Curated annotation (Swiss-Prot):
It comes from the Bacteria. This is tRNA pseudouridine synthase A. Belongs to the tRNA pseudouridine synthase TruA family. The gene is truA. Its EC number is 5.4.99.12. It comes from Mycobacterium tuberculosis (strain ATCC 25618 / H37Rv).
C-alpha cells in the first residue's frame, strides 16, 4: 500500500485591502446645554469631541468631523450637517451588515452609534456624500431660530433649556422695521466677535419676528454667520423692541468697523440651528470653491 503525500495547505488569504477614502454626510441634533460649543477644545466637553470619539472607536482609526456651523457654547441644533472622511477599508468591519432588504445602507451603523453616544447628541442620518460635497463650504445658507418668552413668570420648566426668559414687553413692529435695515449684503463687523483673518461681510437673507401668545420667535437666515452674529443681532433688536434704541439704530451700526459694545448679546440657550441648505449635487464643487474664495477674501 503506497502512501501519497497531501499537498501542503495554502496559507490563509487576507481579504484584499480597499484603497481610498469614503466621505460620509451626517445629519446631527444636540442639546447644547452641557457642551462648550461644537469645536473640539482641550479639557472641554464639546459636540465634535463626543462625536469624533464615538466614530474613532467604531472605525478603529482617528477621524475628524467638519460641520456646517460651529455653534457656540449652549447653542442647540436640530439640523446640523457635518462630513467625515473614513478610510474605505475601515467601513466593512465597523458595523454588522444584517438588515432588511430596502433598509438604508448605513442604518446598522446609525443604530450602533446610538449606543456609543450620550443622550444629548444624536446622529439622525448617515449617507454617502456626493462628489464635491463639503459640509461647510458647499452650504448655500444656514437657518436659525431664536425663541424667548415674555411671560411674567419666565419659561415653563420643560422648555427652560431652549427658550430665553424675557419678562418684558416687546414692540415687534419696531423690531421688524429695524430688521429690514439689516437685510442684504453688509459688513456686520459690529455684530461679530473678531476672528483673525475672517471676513465679517455676510448676506442676511431673512430676519423676521413672530408672536404666539407669550412666545416670541426670530427666524434668521444667511449665507453664513460669523462668530456670535445671530445672538448679537437678536440682542441689538431686543434693545429696539424695548424702546431703548430707535428703529434706525441698527442701520447706523452697519457703518461700524469693529464690534459694538452698545448692546448685550442674547443668551445662547434660546438659539437653535434648524437647517442647512445645499445646491444640487452637480453644483456642490463649484459652490465649495466660491465659498472658500469669499471667506479668505
Amino acid at each position: 500500500m503506497s502512501l501519497t503525500r497531501r499537498p501542503p495547505k495554502s496559507p490563509p488569504q487576507r481579504p484584499p485591502r480597499i484603497s481610498g477614502v469614503v466621505r460620509l454626510r451626517l445629519d446631527i441634533a444636540y442639546d447644547g446645554t452641557d457642551f462648550a460649543g461644537w469645536a473640539a477644545q482641550v479639557g472641554q466637553r464639546t459636540v465634535a469631541g463626543d462625536l469624533d470619539a464615538a466614530l474613532t472607536t467604531i472605525f478603529r482609526t482617528p477621524v475628524r468631523l467638519r460641520a456646517a456651523g460651529r455653534t457656540d457654547a449652549g447653542v442647540h441644533a436640530s439640523g446640523q450637517v457635518a462630513h467625515v472622511d473614513v478610510p474605505a477599508d475601515a467601513l466593512p468591519n465597523a458595523y454588522p451588515r444584517a438588515g432588511h432588504v430596502g433598509d438604508p445602507e448605513f442604518l446598522p451603523l446609525l443604530r450602533r452609534l446610538g449606543r456609543f453616544l450620550p443622550a444629548d447628541v444624536r446622529i439622525l442620518d448617515i449617507t454617502r456624500a456626493p462628489a464635491g460635497f463639503d459640509a461647510r463650504f458647499s452650504a448655500l445658507r444656514r437657518h436659525y431660530v431664536y425663541r424667548l418668552s415674555t411671560a411674567p413668570y419666565g419659561v415653563e420648566p420643560q422648555q427652560a433649556r431652549y427658550i430665553t426668559a424675557w419678562p418684558r414687553e416687546l414692540d415687534l413692529d419696531a423690531m421688524t422695521a429695524a430688521s429690514r435695515d439689516l437685510m442684504g449684503l453688509h459688513d456686520f463687523a459690529a455684530f461679530c466677535r473678531h476672528r483673525e483673518g475672517a471676513t465679517t461681510i455676510r448676506d442676511l437673507q431673512r430676519l423676521d419676528w413672530s408672536r404666539a401668545g407669550t412666545l416670541v420667535t426670530a427666524h434668521v437666515t444667511a449665507d453664513a454667520f460669523c462668530w456670535s452674529m445671530v445672538r448679537s443681532l437678536v440682542g441689538a433688536l431686543l434693545a429696539v423692541g424695548e424702546h431703548r434704541r430707535a428703529t434706525t439704530w441698527c442701520r447706523e451700526l452697519l457703518t461700524a468697523t469693529g464690534r459694538s459694545s452698545d448692546f448685550a448679546v442674547a443668551p445662547a440657550h434660546g438659539l437653535t440651528l434648524i437647517q442647512v441648505d445645499y445646491p444640487p449635487d452637480d453644483q456642490l464643487a463649484s459652490r465649495n470653491l466660491v465659498t472658500r474664495d469669499v471667506r479668505s477674501g
